[in-house]
């Protein structure tokens, strides 16, 4: 008979009743009926590096406040004998959980203590083995060890952030915020006295195809290069507590699901702990109040720390410096991952605030988009810390809005965004865009993001990731400085140049030359930021290069790399030889959005792709392509597969594909066609043969 210790050592036991075979402490005068009975299980005996171990505690006793009346302490011992402390949290009636993402390979052990306010205690032990997964996880984000403005992952690989955020709420009260999401809609039809719109196909009022769902949102943005998601409670979102003595269990659960969904689609998470909640910001001497703030900080770390990369204390709030002097060390003391910390309003001069996170809304003249971005970047970087602009977008005067347009969008918005983004990349800062896309006139500020904006981001991110983690700002000299501004990045092996024609965006720049010091023995690729076209390939020599610049109208980039020509869809054909750069099956010359694989047609030219356009031809009559008398945008199951696209659980992740409705791993391939649904590196067929779960990335055959 194998002992409990032996079973734990081999990982063959995944659950244990704490009452049996482990220590139990109870009051001396307690009856047998007062024994604290707890059962704990763990989600797997084998956890890939940086993936999440989850321990569940089943306990049926009733408590007045189960968030506070039960305390769970987990002491983990790493393979190198380091001890790490994490806490548990209340999940739902009868269930508590604890989470941990291991960052060291080998066998881990842990000791559990579960106690309540009645003086009862139960304790137990467990173990798991941390392995390197077949599909590697690069770890959490860290400040670059040599460049204070860049980030790298734990494994040392590069990270070039570009972020997005939006509103969330369970407005239909079905227990999820993911089944309803609003994407690119036209100008609204529900205004009582709508202003006249400018002429042109992009300025039309009509219905939208909303609601959609979060799978469509995260897939559309993730596959185009967005890789940072910012979320905070009470910030166009739900609250996580009624007050600091009463936490909300359902809202905690939907936050779990939201962060897990973002990570599934490749997003890293900037987590705002308090948002707009007032938390004794200007009462640093309120010991009782600050103790409650600390309690919620620890709850947040215990519950979400395994999914988060950056912590953000507040959103657009002022707090006394002494409040931060108390809270920063406390957050650092309870966070086993040492995630970088920021806040808003920004306080970059404070010790312990590791990211400068200003907010910036502007509708500048597009010819100055690079100039104003560069000026702000230089100012924000004076503190020697990474800069992630926590909110970025357009704006207009609320009292004097632009006639007929609103604040979130105009027909030059995508271009301004493109120029800002490229300039930000070359100044070592990043933006998080506040997305308000349910309507083009939905607000007086924020930004409307559609397929045009997404494909511009995809072009830039593909360029960025062909650089390396060590690129830093560099000097470039242009021959026509009264017409073109130039910016450069370079490392020992790679380099990039970005040129903006700021004189006008209508005539071509010709005869331009630039002087720049570059790594040699490689090729340079003149790259169009609008569509990734390779305009010219040149030989690069080590040292100063005097280069002839191909003619261009708005902007142009130069990529210097030894890795060969850019290939944005990784299909083996470089961009200048590839007739379908987004690999969506529609040739680029017939693709309205050749870099966005979610859209390819735009019949009315309104920059809303036909897949999400409720009126494809812009005639004011909603589409009814199946001719059943019901406008398509009102049909929840347009593809007829029996799964509605929104307002239900489960929802259809592929609402226009009758053969697909679920995407377990967020790779853009529906489970019915995907040979590895959970993306754990083990084909589904192999998992079924081995008896493991092909939909669970932590359940796979033992190698």
Regions found by a protein language model. Give the residues of each.
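Bacterial N-terminal signal peptides
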Residues: 11-23
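Non-catalytic, glycine-rich low-complexity segments
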Residues: 31-80, 86-88, 127-133, 142, ...
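Aromatic- and carboxylate-lined catalytic core of secreted/periplasmic carbohydrate-active enzymes
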Residues: 36-47, 62, 395-397, 405, ...
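Short strand-edge motifs at loop-to-beta-strand transitions and within beta-strands
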Residues: 53, 96-98, 545-547
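Active-site mouth of glycoside hydrolases
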Residues: 71, 117, 138-367, 372, ...
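Extended acidic/polar, glycine-enriched regions
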Residues: 75, 84-148
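Extracellular glycoside hydrolase catalytic/binding regions
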Residues: 295, 315-455
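Extracellular calcium-associated, cysteine-rich motifs in secreted modular proteins
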Residues: 564-703
